């Protein structure tokens, strides 16, 4: 039984490493020699995946689920990153290691592949294709950060909420033809926290959008019409 368990675990790890290899566009054979240094873990909704800098020695590949990464700077400001499956994180300090105060939490049940940050840095130095892919992913990460900040600069609360919906659809939404689907983690309280407005104001704006058939709550998930993006999406 123990041998079967180990075999199953190794097969799972191999499968996820192949998914990572596809994501960064390299042959699986490049990662295969380092399989023993990697791991697959499952997290339940609300569970902390890591808190840096105490746990900043790993890079993670999100296999399934949604996460929120809350980055705290020295002034106490909070920058939030939302991610869905098929993303590598955190990679902003991959090439210039420094302490990063970042809390990563599972918004839904999640499965992640972990590997040492030093291993990924080594692979980048040894393989130009990996370096170029990671560099492009870092740029995408910074663009996401910029879009989030731009949404928060909107003067009017309604525009801010709409732009945040657009931002969330672009980062964690699932394209369903005429609309985007956002999983059940999204709440009015979270939207109000992100927008820097009261829960009452956020709730009133979202109610207006529901009346306009631009936002629908389908059971626990959100359906956001693409018509919402026409004029104000960043």
UniProtKB/Swiss-Prot annotation:
<dbReference type="InterPro" id="IPR036390">
    <property type="entry name" value="WH_DNA-bd_sf"/>
</dbReference>
<dbReference type="GO" id="GO:0005737">
    <property type="term" value="C:cytoplasm"/>
</dbReference>
<dbReference type="GO" id="GO:0030552">
    <property type="term" value="F:cAMP binding"/>
</dbReference>
<dbReference type="Pfam" id="PF00027">
    <property type="entry name" value="cNMP_binding"/>
</dbReference>
<dbReference type="InterPro" id="IPR000595">
    <property type="entry name" value="cNMP-bd_dom"/>
</dbReference>
<comment type="function">
    <text>Positively regulates the expression of the arcABDCR operon under anaerobic conditions, thus playing an essential role in arginine catabolism. May also control the expression of genes encoding proteins which are involved in anaerobic metabolism. Can bind cyclic AMP.</text>
</comment>
<keyword id="KW-0805">Transcription regulation</keyword>
<dbReference type="InterPro" id="IPR018490">
    <property type="entry name" value="cNMP-bd_dom_sf"/>
</dbReference>
<keyword id="KW-0114">cAMP</keyword>
<protein>
    <recommendedName>
        <fullName>HTH-type transcriptional regulator ArcR</fullName>
    </recommendedName>
</protein>
<dbReference type="InterPro" id="IPR036388">
    <property type="entry name" value="WH-like_DNA-bd_sf"/>
</dbReference>
<dbReference type="GO" id="GO:0003677">
    <property type="term" value="F:DNA binding"/>
</dbReference>
<keyword id="KW-0963">Cytoplasm</keyword>
<feature type="binding site">
    <location>
        <begin position="40"/>
        <end position="129"/>
    </location>
    <ligand>
        <name>a nucleoside 3',5'-cyclic phosphate</name>
    </ligand>
</feature>
<feature type="domain" description="HTH crp-type">
    <location>
        <begin position="155"/>
        <end position="228"/>
    </location>
</feature>
<dbReference type="InterPro" id="IPR014710">
    <property type="entry name" value="RmlC-like_jellyroll"/>
</dbReference>
<keyword id="KW-0010">Activator</keyword>
<keyword id="KW-0804">Transcription</keyword>
<keyword id="KW-0238">DNA-binding</keyword>
<keyword id="KW-0116">cAMP-binding</keyword>
<feature type="DNA-binding region" description="H-T-H motif">
    <location>
        <begin position="188"/>
        <end position="207"/>
    </location>
</feature>
<keyword id="KW-0547">Nucleotide-binding</keyword>
